[in-house]
């Protein structure tokens, strides 16, 4: 009408503020570890990808060529940052990733390893609940490193050397490369999960601003060779 108008505004950004790269101070084997806990308000989206090609020569028999001989896991984790300092630290970490370029270690945040007995300060063998690792364990990327989160907030990272049969059918033993230097009961661990070498699976990450100091982010990640 003569008193109501509707318009669509498009803004050009004349200049952007440079974001300083900020790498994680937690490292394992000289590679940063991303230990920020995800926002588990919904299930993690996960799918398995393989570098496979179907070879069909028209003779009636087809073959599959799996280049990597292993699956690559793609997961999408949600994160919630609740203040400006957390947001600034995340944006600095994101800049250090350079999209898909720079890899990092990331806990799977899955309860894959459940201890059942106390481990002593000098021991390198942990008794865990049976998950079939002794039977099906294969030293492949994503199953050779583990992350241990103690109830005091300290992270420990270890290389898994082997799995073996336990004293009962409900247990297995997991050998790690280094002892913890302290006694630990099963309830002393907040989380124990596999540690995967990972990279972002996108070059651009959308940051969803809820307010001027609260943002939500969904990070697609893809496992890589360690």
Where are these regions (language model features)?
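Extracellular/virion structural assembly segments
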Residues: 1-226
